[in-house]
Amino acid sequence: MMKHFLLVVNILAVTLPFLAADIQNQEQTTCRENEERLFHQVTAPYIPVHYVMNRYPQYEPSYYLRRQAVPTLNPFMLNPYYVKPIVFKPNVQVPHWQILPNIHQPKVGRHSHPFFMAILPNKMQDKAVTPTTNTIAAVEPTPIPTTEPVVSTEVIAEASPELIISPETTTEATAASAAA
């Protein structure tokens, strides 16, 4: 955008002195004093700016193909890759993807897309497939513990006097041994 602006400014800067001189000459021709000067006078040809802008929209020669920044998968566009026709004969290698030499290649790295990829045949289709699972150690699923509320059905009996006395005797025995 800045290039276009600078180009238009340069065109106007070049053409304005000629336009100003032409206007001054028109004022002098109204007097009609010097007819010889009008006959030998050379003026710059008038080129309108909109003609230049419509004629050369890019203002510079384009030596490269204009390509989109993001490639699209359009079936009507030329793709830089093509496949040679394959005739299957014994002991013949399948040709790989070829690059067209006359199309401008992008400078970024190529990313393979599933649309352009060839699927190679599986070479081990002839052999019998053996399972590779370990039959010695069988895998057992781990049980998941379930959390259920525990309800006790036992009835708590009242404490007997023996249970109350027995701790007192032990405390008396420990107190007597501590005093000695």
From Swiss-Prot:
Mammary gland specific. Secreted in milk. It comes from the Eukaryota. InterPro entries: Casein_kappa. Pfam families: Casein_kappa (PF00997). The modification Phosphoserine is found at residue 160. Transmembrane segments: none annotated. It is found in: Secreted. One of its GO terms (biological process) is protein stabilization. It comes from Oryctolagus cuniculus (Rabbit). Kappa-casein stabilizes micelle formation, preventing casein precipitation in milk. This is Kappa-casein. Keywords: Glycoprotein, Milk protein, Phosphoprotein, Secreted, Signal. Glycans are attached at residues 132, 142, 147, 153, 160. The record marks 116-117 as: Cleavage. Belongs to the kappa-casein family. Residues 1-21 form the signal peptide. The keyword Ribosomal protein does not apply. GO terms for cellular component: extracellular space. Its main location: secreted.
